[in-house]
Amino acid sequence: MAVNENEIGTVQTQATAPAPQPTAQRQAQRPTGAPGSTTGINHLMRRSGRLDGSDARSADALQVFTKVKEEAIRHQDLPDDFDIHRFDRDAQQVGMAGLLIVKLAKDINGSMKAFVRTLVLDNLPGTRIRPRTHKINNGLTDDIIEEKVLPRDVFTAQYWSKIGEFLRNRYNIPGLEVLSAGPRAVYADFDFKDELAVKNLLVESVNICEDAIARRNNETPFSIATHIKAENEQLTCNLDYNGIPVKDSCGNPIRSDMVISTSRGKKTNVPENEFYDTDSQLNQVSLFVDLHWTPTTGQQQGMFGVTLPGAALPPQFTPYIVITDVRKASWIQAWTLEMWLFALGNAYRATASQAWARTLMPKIATSKMRDIGALGYYSELGKAIETRTEAFMADDSNFVMLMNKMVNQNPAFQIDIDPMGDNSAIEQVILDAAGGVNQARAVSLIFQALTNLYGTDFRQFYNLAEAGPIIFDNHHEVDLGHYTDEHGELSDRRDLDVLGAMNMSEGNDQEWKTWYATQVGNDHIVRRMNNSKGFDKMYLGNVTYTGRARRLTFNPKFITAMDAAAAAAGVTVTMENLITNFGQQRFAGYTGMGNMAVSGSAQVGMAGSMGQTYGAPSYNAPGTWY
């Protein structure tokens, strides 16, 4: 849902509702179909039995969630101050059923509100629901394309309006304002028998409702100047290259070629309490590097501005660092826009000593799709380069030479926004900032959050009039889902990126470019994504699709402005395992960057030192209103 002018993730509902009825009648009441329509047959001519079982999943979900709620309250993991409501598909005449996690609370003005996290339950296979049908002209005739209905297609203004009406009747409070704490899709393969997973989803949902309540009541926002201020502490970043996918709250794998985690710990030579003052992780951001084909002409300039010998072509590919997941540490309960932006900013640490490039280094055990040697198809050689050999991997300079020759050395930054994901309430603000009727309000909220976070007016670091929008929407949508990889493990469908398709097409230029056109071409988006699924089937096998994300591109000036604001706030960041050189050569400093590529690299200290402090610490900067 869109950002409301008064509240992040707020969705205004009608101010009045039908007069309340006795509880027994309210629970039995079912809306009827429109006069003369077939949708209301089962409501007008009701019978007891049913075969489609379309609401059985919501009944099962409610039973398990209620059981888990009672246990969590008994163990004092949750307070007994929230409700769980079943929102039936048939009773409400909506495309998918849902569970509503609801907290009633008064706002700062004493007005009672309902804060709702909506868990939209994806239909099980075989459930009666009409696919979306598109008629798209191809120049001569029309293509008829059927598209599976996703939870995000169902969670519309009409769906939300019905939730508001349902809750006003349920609580018997006419005029109750119902505010969204963000939707979450629960896909068909989620196992409600896994009570630990259900508990995590429930606790997360309750906390997200409380995040919305706290924001509505002007809670003092998270601030580095306020919350990370001990002079004997420092922030440390750890780079993890193991490539194991992280999981979302529903157990779906998320591509994580690099995970950058931020922790707060004691500075060197400062004694610690062995059992208490251990490093505390604060957040983490997951990413991978997609190499986009950006063919150019002319000679290639390598390190130090030297023309590389024998290079007839400049680098043909530009790295895009794609952020796939932003999350807090599990021990932290609150999750606000300030905290999300704090975690996001650490993605820029991947530029330190070109750390992002290490995600592309060849490894014998990695998937064929990750073989950087496929870049050779678009070099003077015209064929793949053998990189997964002991001879190639014995000397890092081989990798450095290949990267210098084929890849621009300043990356751009992108992020995948899932409007039905774990961070839907926060990330809707980012999506709105990329365009639409709420853009100005969303950008204002982000600037205020960054001011709160760093203790200095963010406009000092980023001038909108001069720098332009902070993020761009090129209407690039990405299917979310998972497949079984060659090791028998569930993996993220996004493994099939530009390099992956290049490897799978095995040098067939026409096939690879046809695949590429399904990702970033100018064709109708529905037809592109339908054709993309055909390549998924060819290259990945059976794919379970769970949703769709919008891939946005950050303005590079915004990324560097966040880093500058952190430096001015006196943030000390030490990189624990940063490797600065590949063999004897460093892959850094190429001056020819694309329009969206960042220049320079993140300001960090090195492990083993006291860290590097930029600017004077401002530990007592006041938190500002939000």
UniProtKB/Swiss-Prot annotation:
Organism this protein belongs to: Pseudomonas phage phiKZ
Q: What is its main location?
A: host cell
Record text on subunit structure and interactions:
Homotetramer. The tetrameric protomers further assemble as a square grid.
Q: What does the function comment of this entry state?
A: Self-assembles to form a proteinaceous shell that encloses the viral DNA and compartmentalizes proteins and DNA during viral infection. This micrometer-scale compartment contains narrow pores and is the site of viral replication, with the proteins involved in DNA replication localized inside. Provides a surface for docking of capsids during packaging. Probably protects the viral genome against host defenses.
Q: Where is this region: Disordered?
A: 1-44
Listed GO CC annotations: host cell cytoplasm
Which top-rank group of organisms is this from? Answer: Viruses
Q: What keywords does the record list, in alphabetical order?
A: Host cytoplasm
Compartments, record wording: Host cytoplasm
Report what the protein is called.
Answer: Chimallin
Assigned protein family: Belongs to the Phikzvirus chimallin family.
Ranges of biased composition (kind: Low complexity): 12-32
Q: Where is the signal peptide?
A: none
